[in-house]
Amino acid sequence: MRILVTDGMDKTAMAQLREHGHEVVEQFYEPDQLGEALRGFDVAVVRSKTKVRKEHIDAAKGGQLKLIIRGGVGVDNIDVDYAKANGIDVKNTPRASSQSVAELAMGHMFACARYLSIAGHTMREGKWEKKAYGKGIELQGKTLGIVGFGRIGQHLGVMAKAIGMKVIAFDIYQIPVISEQLDIPYVEMDELLAQADFVSVHAPAVDGGALISAENIAKMKDGVVIINTSRGSNVDEDALLAALESGKVRAAGLDVYADEPASNVALYSHPMVSCTPHIGAATVEAQKRIGQEIVEIIAAM
């Protein structure tokens, strides 16, 4: 089979595919070129950079394309239903990056609690702000509210409990056996917002507006910390910035943004924002696992 890799892939996994007799082409296509290019491939492997929309699927009709694989979890960059309606299957790799994303969320929690981002920045400016940043808080004993309790949320919950946090979770699809095994109770959204000292979002993008809206921020504790490593659209960035300015929100840790590359300079430049450029799954280990899942998916075709 001919396999297109648009946004990079683990080299070992690509070598395996070639050893199995497949032709692997590593090439990024601009949106106006993508649809026509897809006609010549049986499989397309994409990451978040490549968007496969209706017009690309229409342009690929009559060609070879049978499968689109999203290397990662979220498939909101692919018009999944339209692809399937046109005979093109869509798969993702949900297991591979869960630990990496959860660890980054935990890292942002520590950064927000102890001023790690701004303290490091000011030191590089030659400043010694010991008093200014000597008002950190511990995570032990605090309540973490996880919004979206899938694989990533579960990994984060286990780590948070290990350092002595109380963990509660909200998910529209509740799996009682998971809650019981991890000893992490489900609660309603409003209860989570009212109880949590830290709110970490791990839900897919939702229709109908941001999960972390001005209305929901108002329901949170004063001094709450908000973490988002899911999708940028899950947080109303203007509402978050206003809450940071007012002190309602103590700090925020962000890996994803409404626009990417991020364009809300006031938000990501705020001294109480710990920010990273959408690198949740960008670890050596996660990329190897993603590559192996892709190899397995193609082998099963």
Model-based region annotation:
Residues 153-154:
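N-terminal Rossmann-fold NAD(P) dinucleotide-binding loop
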Residues 60-66, 86-88, 165, 222-224, ...:
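A short helix->loop->beta-strand "cap" motif at the edges of active sites that frequently abuts
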Residues 84, 91-104, 129, 256-301:
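C-terminal helix-to-coil terminal segments
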Residues 86-88, 93-143, 158:
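Phosphate-binding beta-alpha-beta segment of Rossmann-like dinucleotide-binding domains, i.e.
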Residues 1-90, 191-194, 213-215:
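An N-terminal-biased, well-structured beta-alpha scaffold segment characteristic
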Residues 12, 162-180:
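NAD(P)-binding Rossmann-fold cofactor-contacting core
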Residues 51-56, 172-266, 282:
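Rossmann-like adenosine-cofactor binding region
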Residues 149-150:
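Glycine-rich Rossmann-fold phosphate-binding loop(s) that bind the pyrophosphate
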